[in-house]
Regions:
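Structured adenosyl-cofactor binding patch, chiefly the S-adenosyl-L-methionine
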Residues: 115-157
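Active-site/ligand-binding-proximal alpha/beta "capping" segment
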Residues: 72-73, 77-112, 117-118, 127-129
Length: 157
């Protein structure tokens, strides 16, 4: 996931612990994982000829991640959600994007976001979007939405 995110233009990756995440990391294991993920990000940046090496942040809770994007004044935050219907939401989001904007994308865990996490996202102003009729795996959803963002922000449409 880290490798593909970096290759597709992500400026950074913050691992988020959610209720349905299959892997639960204690603090010591999380630090080791983040170091490994950072090495993957560096390798992917080099391979894809990026001039900037995206940083992998420390693992945080979903609530902490929502607070972080609020504090950092992201221009837009969205959450692909399998119960969101139709493609109008993602079309509207893509239509409003402009180069240079800070965009946060929350990709769900293997078990998906639970209802309370989605309610929290809505309260925090995170826009739920559909990625189509199919339910995508975590490792597919991230690259799918990043490819759409890259195409839009790099002027392909």
């Amino acid at each position: 996931i880290i490798q593909k995110a970096v290759e597709l233009g992500a400026a950074g990756v913050i691992p988020v612990a959610t209720r349905n995440a299959v892997v639960k990391l204690d603090e010591k294991k999380a630090e080791a994982k983040v170091r490994r993920w950072q090495a993957i990000a560096e390798s992917a940046a080099k391979q894809s000829k990026r001039s900037y090496i995206p940083q992998v942040g420390m693992v945080m809770s979903l609530k902490e991640a929502f607070s972080y994007i609020e504090e950092q004044k992201f221009d837009l935050s969205m959450i692909p959600y399998e119960l969101e219907k139709g493609m109008d939401g993602i079309k509207q989001v893509l239509g409003r994007l402009a180069p240079g904007q800070q965009i946060a994308v929350f990709i769900g865990p293997e078990g998906g976001f639970d209802e309370e996490e989605i309610k929290l996202a809505l309260r925090m102003g995170v826009k739920p979007v559909s990625l189509g009729k199919r339910i995508l795996r975590t490792e597919t959803a991230g690259p799918a939405i990043l490819a759409l963002l890259m195409m839009k922000l790099e002027g392909a449409f």
